[in-house]
């Protein structure tokens, strides 16, 4: 069968030139895309022709004589063609031998023209390499040597969940110990049972650049992150302030984007799903001369699922008063302004440039006191009810080798805007307090802030007799300032009051300095000590300065692939956010302390080769102090939580079948002044146990055709909530009544089917919540509602790679 190599090569060269001219400016068109030797041009032309007509032995004979002399892309091209010839001759062993040599030449080799069976060999050989990460120690190391338990989520694992998943759902599926929590329009996460009003206990990064804002330390785990751009997600399960400082309390999530060399083309993808959902992605990448360029753009919009009391379960009756017909709960609605993610990375020799802009606009599921009618409310500054967050980021880095010392310098900036447009509920039929407050009132709050910073890091390797190791040290500075704010009040859905007085003047600034050091010492090739220490000082506005010392100590033993042991002690902190400290200062509370986590973890991991099984088991003890919770009329910084737990992960891969399972269990040892039920010994809103199972099966795999079936199941144990009710007394005082409510355990199934042709065209059908099970999330406040999750929904998608 003939293969149209020449047409593809011509198209790719045009694409390479177009991207390079656009992003790098004018570049001589006669420059070669790679370091190949044009003297082999005639040899390759003849070899391609012989391969197309089945003269495989002639191709092998011709290339065998020259491949040893080749370098760069010429050698890669020869090795690829030789492997394809052996594969066509059904000599799989020889094909794998040359494919292995090809990967040694280029770890990121990828070619959309390859037959599917050859792509399978390449992917399998790639997977055989030990995964290296940089998130845990800021240096390249294997997962086995990382000083903390690590979860790696690959692009394939993300695809196996379907196209309509947000970041929080992906993390909750693959990371044991992580669970979604929710507060009306904010996608939040808990780790080992700890959470806060903003997603401030887990540090989220993109290529090492912090995404959590500095106003309230939060970052929503929603659709403002394109999943199609992701190469992998590295998750550190445990405290990491010794390297990253503030916010890295219970976990670190580092999103690693694809490289231009890996994609080497243009990919376009579109999906349409239930509830008026549209999702689109475009990714472009290439390597031109010494520059690696990757560009992405993503768009998400959805009307969301509309729920009413009559089509819900008995849970709704536990939380809401009667309401007018035509008003809804809006579940996962993203509309009014598009939710998008655009950005690019450029690497040129030692330089790296990152630029991105992310926007999220999510509808509140409920109004202030229950169901509401989104369409009745007027726009304010072109914004409708819901929560919006816009972030623009820019970073420039430079790496250089100065003798034995590696230097890394970076400067960066983040410009952040939050909008909170809260709508009241519909008019009620009764005479409760809510009726007086629910006459189409609304509240609009906008804040803008800016962060500028820089860092300098140096590292070097050393030897001490038969021992060796690596040390690094660094310094970081940040300047944060609130630059603008606006508060408005409205009534009657469309009426607008004059600009309201600011409850607090947030237009102030703060500076912070951080100094850190780390040593990784190999006593033996199999015995490693990893120690780190970071000192942070924050010059806080109108409050005492705060300092934090964050240590980490890890002892790692890696005797063989079947067994690796890891014992880790670490401490981390989250300073109370600028927003909440400033708000509480106005009511006389200026004694907020940093939130702390001290953790002890014992991990066992390894591979059981005969069973094709990998495993990871982690036993942890956590001691949280000074946790922050929102109370009904104020805030509390005195929360204490101590718990023990177990995490376990197992993965299996053989031929066309891949499967993974993870499980989590925790037990509260002590809890005070926190979201905790003493009678049930349970943390409110989070499960005691979860189990996830994910399976992928290639039903068909033949040359250019592949048909894959994938599915997942998630078991979540029951959760307890603290229901709060307000009763208006005859003298207009308010009586607050609280009671505990149980949400039943659930089992949610997803399934999908994907067809791929020639590694270019992909068609997929995804079904989320296959059994249409009612399930709910709850959030970090004493106004604990049972927030709906989506019911059964379908999405069809198509993608094409040029």
Regions found by a protein language model. Give the residues of each.
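Extracytoplasmic beta-strand/coil segments of soluble accessory domains associated
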Residues: 150, 168-209, 213
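Short acidic/polar hinge/loop motifs at secondary-structure boundaries
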Residues: 209-237
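Periplasmic-side early beta-strands and strand-to-turn transitions of outer-membrane beta-barrels
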Residues: 262, 271, 287-383
């Amino acid at each position: 069968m003939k293969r149209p190599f020449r047409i593809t090569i011509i198209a790719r060269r045009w694409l390479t030139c177009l991207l390079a001219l656009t992003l790098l400016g004018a570049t001589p068109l006669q420059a070669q895309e790679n370091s190949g030797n044009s003297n082999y041009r005639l040899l390759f032309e003849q070899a391609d022709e012989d391969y197309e007509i089945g003269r495989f032995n002639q191709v092998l004979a011709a290339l065998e004589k020259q491949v040893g002399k080749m370098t760069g892309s010429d050698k890669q091209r020869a090795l690829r063609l030789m492997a394809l010839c052996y594969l066509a001759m059904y000599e799989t062993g020889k094909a794998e031998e040359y494919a292995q040599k090809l990967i040694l030449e280029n770890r990121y080799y990828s070619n959309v023209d390859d037959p599917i069976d050859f792509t399978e060999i390449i992917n399998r050989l790639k997977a055989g390499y030990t995964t290296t990460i940089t998130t845990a120690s800021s240096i390249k190391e294997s997962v086995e040597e990382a000083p903390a338990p690590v979860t790696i989520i690959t692009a394939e694992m993300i695809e196996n969940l379907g196209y309509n998943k947000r970041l929080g759902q992906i993390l909750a599926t693959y990371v044991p110990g992580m669970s979604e929590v929710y507060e009306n329009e904010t996608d939040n996460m808990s780790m080992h049972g700890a959470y806060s009003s903003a997603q401030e206990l887990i540090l989220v990064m993109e290529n090492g650049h912090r995404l959590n804002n500095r106003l309230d330390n939060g970052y929503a785990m929603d659709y403002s992150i394109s999943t199609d751009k992701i190469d992998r997600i590295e998750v550190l399960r445990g405290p990491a302030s010794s390297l990253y400082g503030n916010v890295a309390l219970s976990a670190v999530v580092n999103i690693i984007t694809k490289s231009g060399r890996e994609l080497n083309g243009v990919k376009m993808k579109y999906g349409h799903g239930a509830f008026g959902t549209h999702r689109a992605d475009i990714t472009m990448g290439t390597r031109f001369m010494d520059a690696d360029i990757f560009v992405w753009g993503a768009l998400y919009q959805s009307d969301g699922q509309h729920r009413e009391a009559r089509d819900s379960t008995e849970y709704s009756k536990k939380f809401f008063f009667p309401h007018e017909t035509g008003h809804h709960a809006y579940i996962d609605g993203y509309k009014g302004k598009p939710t998008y993610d655009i950005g690019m990375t450029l690497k040129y020799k030692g330089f790296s440039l990152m630029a991105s802009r992310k926007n999220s606009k999510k509808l509140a599921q409920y109004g202030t006191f229950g169901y509401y009618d989104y369409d009745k409310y007027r726009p304010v500054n072109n914004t409708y009810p819901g929560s919006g967050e816009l972030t623009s980021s820019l970073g420039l880095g430079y790496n250089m080798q100065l003798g034995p010392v590696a230097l890394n310098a970076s400067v960066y900036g983040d410009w952040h805007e939050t909008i909170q447009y809260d709508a009241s509920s519909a008019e009620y039929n009764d005479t409760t307090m809510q009726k007086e407050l629910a006459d189409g009132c609304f509240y609009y709050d906008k804040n803008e802030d800016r962060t500028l910073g820089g860092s300098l890091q140096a590292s070097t390797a050393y030897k001490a007799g038969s021992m060796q190791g690596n040390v690094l040290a660094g310094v970081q500075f940040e300047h944060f300032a609130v630059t603008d704010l606006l508060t408005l009040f409205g009534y009657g859905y469309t009426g607008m009051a004059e600009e309201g007085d600011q409850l607090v003047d947030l237009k102030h600034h703060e500076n912070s300095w951080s100094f850190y050091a780390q040593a990784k010492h190999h006593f033996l090739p199999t015995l490693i000590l990893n120690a780190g220490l970071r000192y942070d000082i924050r010059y806080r506005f109108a409050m005492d300065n705060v300092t934090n010392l964050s240590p980490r100590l890890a002892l790692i033993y890696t005797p063989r692939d079947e067994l690796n042991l890891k014992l880790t002690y670490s401490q981390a902190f989250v300073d109370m956010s600028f927003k909440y400290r400033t708000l509480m200062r106005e009511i006389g509370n200026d004694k907020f302390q940093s939130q702390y986590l001290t953790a002890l973890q014992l991990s066992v991991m390894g591979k059981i080769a005969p069973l094709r099984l990998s495993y990871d088991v982690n036993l942890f003890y956590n001691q949280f102090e000074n946790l922050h919770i929102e109370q009904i009329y104020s805030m509390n910084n005195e929360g204490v939580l101590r718990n023990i737990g177990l995490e376990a992960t197992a993965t299996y891969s053989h031929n066309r079948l891949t499967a993974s399972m993870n499980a989590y269990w925790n037990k509260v040892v002590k809890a005070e002044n926190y979201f905790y039920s003493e009678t049930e010994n349970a943390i409110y809103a989070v499960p005691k146990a979860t189990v996830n199972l994910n399976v992928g099966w290639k039903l068909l795999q033949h040359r250019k055709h592949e048909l894959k079936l994938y599915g997942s199941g998630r078991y979540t144990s029951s959760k307890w909530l603290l229901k709060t009710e307000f009763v208006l007394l005859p003298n207009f005082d308010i009586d607050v009544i609280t009671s505990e409510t149980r949400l039943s355990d659930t089992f949610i199934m997803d399934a999908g089917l994907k067809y791929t042709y020639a590694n270019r065209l992909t068609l997929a059908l995804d079904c989320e919540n296959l059994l249409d099970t009612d399930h709910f999330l709850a959030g970090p406040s004493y106004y604990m509602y049972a927030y709906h999750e989506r019911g059964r929904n379908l999405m069809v998608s198509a993608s094409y790679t040029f």
